[in-house]
Amino acid sequence: MRTSLQAVALWGQKAPPHSITAIMITDDQRTIVTGSQEGQLCLWNLSHELKISAKELLFGHSASVTCLARARDFSKQPYIVSAAENGEMCVWNVTNGQCMEKATLPYRHTAICYYHCSFRMTGEGWLLCCGEYQDVLIIDAKTLAVVHSFRSSQFPDWINCMCIVHSMRIQEDSLLVVSVAGELKVWDLSSSINSIQEKQDVYEKESKFLESLNCQTIRFCTYTERLLLVVFSKCWKVYDYCDFSLLLTEVSRNGQFFAGGEVIAAHRILIWTEDGHSYIYQLLNSGLSKSIYPADGRVLKETIYPHLLCSTSVQENKEQSRPFVMGYMNERKEPFYKVLFSGEVSGRITLWHIPDVPVSKFDGSPREIPVTATWTLQDNFDKHDTMSQSIIDYFSGLKDGAGTAVVTSSEYIPSLDKLICGCEDGTIIITQALNAAKARLLEGGSLVKDSPPHKVLKGHHQSVTSLLYPHGLSSKLDQSWMLSGDLDSCVILWDIFTEEILHKFFLEAGPVTSLLMSPEKFKLRGEQIICCVCGDHSVALLHLEGKSCLLHARKHLFPVRMIKWHPVENFLIVGCADDSVYIWEIETGTLERHETGERARIILNCCDDSQLVKSVLPIASETLKHKSIEQRSSSPYQLGPLPCPGLQVESSCKVTDAKFCPRPFNVLPVKTKWSNVGFHILLFDLENLVELLLPTPLSDVDSSSSFYGGEVLRRAKSTVEKKTLTLRKSKTACGPLSAEALAKPITESLAQGDNTIKFSEENDGIKRQKKMKISKKMQPKPSRKVDASLTIDTAKLFLSCLLPWGVDKDLDYLCIKHLNILKLQGPISLGISLNEDNFSLMLPGWDLCNSGMIKDYSGVNLFSRKVLDLSDKYTATLPNQVGIPRGLENNCDSLRESDTIVYLLSRLFLVNKLVNMPLELACRVGSSFRMESIHNKMRGAGNDILNMSSFYSCLRNGKNESHVPEADLSLLKLISCWRDQSVQVTEAIQAVLLAEVQQHMKSLGKIPVNSQPVSMAENGNCEMKQMLPKLEWTEELELQCVRNTLPLQTPVSPVKHDSNSNSANFQDVEDMPDRCALEESESPGEPRHHSWIAKVCPCKVS
């Protein structure tokens, strides 16, 4: 089970596009939900004063959102459902932004109604769906599986709109629909539940042609239980629900097209149009006068007309786009507002407060209802500009005072920690990503802004549209090469270390929209080739070694959507937007075939090496673990603009078989349009970060001996007796250890091929070091070249982003002093990725969306007011005994700092695991907890929770216990129960971090008991029971446990780093039989500083 990834969004000055296609207000009247053409959902906070503020973006769809609806009884579970054009359906928890369920069906829904009859059906209810398919689908609201369907006995057709009628008079529920042909159909709901559950066919009981087309809305009047409002695009009608006889018809005037309507009171109708106007009508004389049908077939004449009382309109805007998406809400709670709301393609939301008794003017003319509130995403960014700065805003000085560089393309190189940004003016900026993030986020950023070396490459005369780092795709290519393309169809090959232009390719085509590389098995002249897709639908193939253009295919009539390779015959297969296929012979440059229709589909399906618009290939060479973001992106093969493009992660394609390894820190550039990058996401992999800081990675050790060390201890004793272990006197037993040396992970040797090139940067230059051979005993392993200082800096930045700065100023000072972490400049936009396809990001100004936080914690990095309550509960559950971690009371500052950081991250890792697990899994560890049983269940579904619990218990007391202590079990249950309370992962992590940091500082005697937030004063007497006991160290040897499959470092001096180095220069390694190294203390009688693995595996060898 994969843990969630923590994210920090570095927005630019411009908000991402959000073209609203669907809108609704939740039943609690606190949240507005909008779906967009770009595929994402936005949650907007709605206050009791009808003030709007954007709060969160939810990513889960890869196509335009078509409709939104309630998915549960909202008072019990705050769930909604969204549907997209490509058949995707997602169930969301709007409280925490989590996607609860997702499915893709071969149906395009245009309307969804939730139905649940508590006394007649079990489960969570049904989603009744209609759209571009016949009749009505019934989908299970929990699993999103198709249950059954309502069928038509005559004239089955697509359904335009529908509504559920709950009649209190006859105690029966009915489903009313109107087809595209204008036929009204009625199905019984209540009496059909058993038939549906038994998979029996259910047909309509009534039907009637309404003699109008393009039905937009059908609504039942709950006030009279007699009126039925049906809105068509050119007229709206009122029918008698008893016999469906026509009572009233109102035809559109001034060329307006109606878009919907609602019955807001008895005999009072609200109608709105596609251009954002609305009208309130009063049906005079009760409005119920039978229509006259002339015998000669002339136009229907009504005896009376409805009286127009009020109207609303939107502000005139030259850039105003249609159609508007509108809706109506009648609040059932105080203050009992009646609200008309609308969403625009421009992303604007507008609210009107409808009076309880609308009246016209004294002269009888309609009264204009003013706009109550209006808001856009850009308003959030303008109001909270400190939170909406991009990752390279501090480079604005490079532009000679002309403002911040406008980023149009971006690429992150994890192996170098380099962020490459192509700008609108043609320049390319290269900087250290982690340092750039620090300068953007932290208060001490002024100290960092001058330190990170940056480079500016100048060679383009137009905007840079695409970037490619070939070495990230194939390790056999030169590490210094980088490709960039611009609007003027110029592709430049750079040496990023020397800043030289190696070659320029002038394609004489349209803008270079994508740079791709051929797969590993497809080589021409012994080398892989580069594919350039241009805006004029042409494709060019470049040979980097020969610095030549091999092919320029120009005959495509439609935008290129797919590139495939045929390695046997050297064919390039191009798929276009019209589903046609072009087959090019690369050597001769001739067009071999052009196919369309079924033949084209067969050809595309026969090729394996595809480069698709929506593939699920990895985003970056070191982010295989970041699957949640990878699969959400539209992949690197984004060949030109899509009709409904979503936000896409920009990166290089990964089509090689190179060995990759995960990274604790990653930067993902995210596109908002095909021509520019809107913002960047910082991704923190907490699990990988803990793996690197703890010398024994959690996921790669034998579970039977990894935490309690029984088998390792026996092996160590046996090996000592045989005198096959290497002993080394510790020269630092009583001396201080640096934080970097303490956190230095066990590293894997570089094993790409037969050799590797190590390099480090000094003063903006590159030092090429000699190649070194690797022992033939070593098995090829993924390159795991990790800079220890970079890892500890990543950990500090991660803690800085999550700490609730400002809640307790004394605690802030102590964290800066004793943990050596910097304070945030202000609240940041946090995010999270919980599963493979969905993630969420907070928007600038999210901290002011909770009314309870505005007064007390304005400008505080507190995720929600709930964090303080959760922190109280966590502190109260902690054991009452107080213990100082071994060695912390007399350790040097750097060692104590590093110990504390690793301890905090380990705790947060545990919380991150538990909060996403069901309660029954977490409680299962309470009965019996022996390591043998874990070994037998290594491949079981509950392995993660058992592993984490053993880790938790070992960190707590360092003893081999057969079961989890009651106090620990209480903590496990508490954290697991938060899931059922709609607690977000970020809330849980921040609450635990606040409690742990505060308790840790108190246990060290650094702060008094009463120096804490007011909300935590009740639990001030609850001290933290420290994890690590004091052990006897009379004749102690430090045992360092490493992976069974990894080579081990020989005793060498600690890794030395340059100030600007990107990777540690690790020494040669040798394979040892037991893969363990024992170090003897220089002063056996004295306690000495031990690495964290000695605390995780407390082994004492006599």
UniProtKB/Swiss-Prot annotation:
It holds the Pfam family WDR72_alpha-sol. WD repeats lie at residues 15-54, 60-102, 160-197, 318-362, 402-441, 459-504, 507-552, 555-594. It is found in: Cytoplasmic vesicle. InterPro entries: WD40/YVTN_repeat-like_dom_sf (IPR015943), WD40_repeat_CS (IPR019775), WD40_repeat_dom_sf (IPR036322), WD40_rpt (IPR001680), WDR7/72 (IPR049916). Disulfide bonds: none annotated. One of its GO terms (cellular component) is cytoplasmic vesicle. Keywords: Amelogenesis imperfecta, Biomineralization, Cytoplasmic vesicle, Phosphoprotein, Repeat, WD repeat. This is WD repeat-containing protein 72. It comes from Homo sapiens. The gene is WDR72.
